[in-house]
UniProtKB/Swiss-Prot annotation:
Belongs to the NAD-dependent DNA ligase family. LigA subfamily. The gene is ligA. Its cofactor is Mg(2+); Mn(2+). The active site is at K108. GO terms for cellular component: cytosol. Gene3D superfamilies: 5' to 3' exonuclease, C-terminal subdomain, 6.20.10.30, BRCT domain, DNA ligase/mRNA capping enzyme, Helix hairpin bin, Nucleic acid-binding proteins. GO terms for biological process: DNA repair; DNA replication. Residues 52-71, 676-695 are annotated as: Disordered. Keywords: DNA damage, DNA repair, DNA replication, Ligase, Magnesium, Manganese, Metal-binding, NAD, Zinc. This is DNA ligase. CDD domains: BRCT_DNA_ligase_like, LIGANc.
């Protein structure tokens, strides 16, 4: 291939993958894209004569697609990208070329860029980066973020300017992403590959209600056009932005030498998991805005800033097998079984392959050396085989078209569906097993005495034909199992506990009953919305899909799934037998979903409360449920709209932000007082001794 042909091929590939990164589903990793772009840059530097026309190395990003449903609007000031370096030698070269009295270092967040235009303190526009000159108008979606105020609030030191563009990154932090994907998996929905895709997709939703469902956050990292605002430094600009009520990174640091910059690069390379969000690099900026102006910019990036990109956290291991798991709604999910490997902070031995199409697309063979990456710090991802290490002993994996649990032929539920499912929903032991363990989980009946082994024993001992018989279990039934009986065949302590827990579960809230039924797509969020609207399971069964879809929190897909579920005879038998056994199928009068007996369901109504750090008597889920049971909103991030921050040990950045914004901080004792008596009146002191909380 000629040099000219290689240049054209690389240019086409870079443009293709950049378009997918911003407006579609990426096909390659960020590291692979960076390698493509770097090869193109190196080739252009060695052979400048091959560049014909515009090169993607000089472009900020692709222009918004012509088919976009969003209005295209010009930025007041061009919104540039950043150049990258990939090792300390390259960084040292940039520092030599860009001497400064003070540098600013900040974490490079892997999210979706946004440009906020405020005129006289009012939010006028929110735009995507677009091609750097023109972005898409996503104002309606931006307004759903708690971190983006409609109105800026000035101070004596930092009055609100006539006009200012504030640049930032919309993202989903690691903890929220894990919870969101777990919820989607529980509801049978497709999981997101990584937080960046989830955040970027959320900001380009046509319906802002869909955007609002995702736990989006914002960190501001720059300014564009401005009138009536002339900060001396980037650091001063961040102080002003924070004073106006917008979030800035708690990890930003001023340093005064190239050596200190390199120390920050080394530090964050060893502590990248300490940040609440995903980060793939460290951004270094010249702090002085006057010096920035003197240095200027190229057509795509400022000369006064650089991004040091850390290597992605990948590792090589051996693929031993590919197995197929059957979920509670019948979805067949292939997963890789690997030699255990420590990567991204934990040891992994399995990785999902999502569906048969994805499994075959990866091109892995049994016995392969494979490259894995922890995607989103939660889901191990198989990137592909290391073909150079193949010995010839590897063998292909043949995806069976039959259910590994019951032998029924697998098939997509509809044409074009990438997921294959076992249609034997009633009698497949694999589906029954996962349904039993799911209904026993904390998000449903919370029966801790019914684990995976116990569920397996109940099924394979012949004690349970399906979950409809669960609440009819007697001591003599459990004595037929190994999990709940002594060697002498008498009921053991676990069996006694199970019977007690089953009795308690009969009084569970209506929303928990709905979750326990394993209706496809119905998780706790949708179940709570339904339980607030309807009085009983029978009311829900009688409702039309259209009526249910009109409820906030119940999408059309969920509504249709519920309607379909109640048309199946054996599903109705579950409801009937549970009711006959004494399971409460109605919402108690005045009982808000999730509320405990005797709790005032309006005690915290209208309050937004954030919990951070470790509490002695509450885990994160219990604290959230306690707040919601009393009518409050349990938020994931601190903003001007936050009423209280509950700070346990190692509270970290959220505590600092709350203090900066003047949000009242509660220790655990004060939190318990709040749950008992509600918020203090306006004349009371709402703050507690935050000094006693470790940062």
């Amino acid at each position: 291939m000629s040099t000219q042909s290689r240049w054209q091929e690389l240019a086409d590939q870079v443009r293709h993958h950049r378009q997918l990164y911003y407006y579609g589903e990426p096909e390659i990793s960020d590291a692979d894209f960076d390698a493509l772009l770097q090869e193109l840059k190196d080739l252009e530097q060695a052979h400048p004569e091959v560049v014909t026309g515009a090169s993607p190395t000089e472009e900020v990003a692709p222009a918004p697609p012509t088919s976009s449903p969003f209005r295209n609007v010009d930025h007041r000031e061009q919104m540039l990208s950043l150049d990258n370096v990939f090792d300390t030698e390259q960084l040292a070269g940039w520092l030599d070329r860009t001497p400064a009295k003070t540098y600013l270092t900040e974490l490079k967040i892997d999210g979706a860029s946004i440009n906020l235009l405020y005129i006289d303190g009012q939010l006028e526009l929110a735009l995507t980066r677009g091609d750097g000159t023109t972005g898409e108008d996503i104002t309606h979606n931006a307004r759903t973020l708690d971190d983006i105020p409609d109105t800026l609030h000035g101070t004596d030191e930092f009055p609100v300017p006539e006009l200012v563009e504030i640049r930032g990154e919309v993202f989903i932090d690691v903890e929220d992403f894990a919870a969101m994907n777990a919820q989607r998996q529980a509801e049978g929905l497709k999981m997101f590959a990584n937080p960046r895709n989830a955040a970027a997709g959320a900001m380009r939703q046509k319906n802002s209600a869909d955007t609002a469902k995702r736990p989006l956050k914002l960190i501001c990292h720059g300014i564009g056009a401005r009138e009536g605002f002339s900060p001396a430094s980037q650091h001063d600009a961040y102080r002003a932005i924070a004073a106006w009520g917008l979030p800035v990174s708690p990890y930003t640091k001023q340093v005064h030498s190239a050596k200190e910059v390199q120390q920050q690069v080394e530090y964050w390379g060893n502590h990248r998991h300490d940040a609440a969000h995903e980060m793939d690099g460290l951004v270094v900026k010249v702090d002085s805005l006057e010096e920035q102006l003197e240095l200027g910019h190229t057509s795509r990036a400022p000369r006064w800033a650089i991004a040091y990109k850390y290597p992605p956290e990948e590792a090589m291991t051996t693929l031993h097998n590919i197995r197929v798991g059957i979920g509670r709604t019948g979805r067949a999910t292939p997963y890789a079984v690997m030699a255990p490997k420590y990567v991204a902070g934990s040891t992994v031995s399995m990785a999902t392959l999502h569906n048969p199409t994805e499994a075959h697309r990866k091109g892995v063979l049994l016995g392969d050396t494979i490259t894995i990456r922890k995607a989103g710090e939660v889901i191990p991802e198989v990137l592909g085989p290391v073909e150079d290490k193949r010995t010839g002993a590897e063998r292909p994996f043949l995806f069976s078209t039959f259910c590994p649990e019951c032998g029924t032929r697998l098939a997509p539920s509809k044409v074009g569906d990438a997921d294959w499912r076992c249609p034997n929903t009633q009698y497949c032991p694999g589906q029954l097993h996962t349904r039993l363990t799911y209904l026993a989980s904390r998000k449903a009946f919370d029966i801790d005495a019914l684990g995976e082994k116990g569920a397996y024993d109940l099924i394979h001992s012949g004690v349970l034909a399906d979950e409809s018989e669960l609440f009819d279990l007697r001591a003599e039934d459990l004595e037929k199992t190994s999990s709940y009986a002594t060697k002498a065949g008498k009921l053991n302590k676990s069996g006694e506990t199970l019977l007690e827990k089953l009795q308690s579960a009969k009084e569970a809230d209506l929303w928990r009953v709905l979750v326990a039924l394993s209706i496809r797509h119905v998780g706790p969020t949708a179940a709570k919305a339904l339980a607030k609207h309807f009085e009983s399971v029978e009311d829900i069964a009688s409702a039309s899909a259209e009526e249910m879809a009109g409820i906030d929190g119940v999408a059309e897909t969920i509504a249709e799934s519920i309607s379909d579920w109640f048309t199946v005879d054996w599903h109705r038998r579950i409801v009937d037998r549970w009711a006959a056994a004494g399971v409460r199928m109605r919402r108690e009068a005045g009982n808000v979903p999730g509320a405990a007996d005797g709790v005032d369901s309006a005690l915290l109504e209208g309050l937004t409360i954030v919990v951070t750090g470790s509490l002695e008597d509450f885990d994160r889920t219990a604290a959230k449920e306690a707040i919601e049971a009393r009518g409050g909103k349990a938020a994931g991030s601190v903003s001007k709209k936050t009423d209280f921050l509950v700070a346990g040990e190692k509270a970290g950045s959220k505590l600092k932000k709350a203090e900066d914004l003047g949000v009242p901080v509660l220790d655990e004792a004060a939190f318990k007082e709040l749950l008992e008596n509600g918020a203090p009146s306006s004349g009371d002191d709402a703050s507690t001794s935050a000094d006693s909380v470790d940062d």
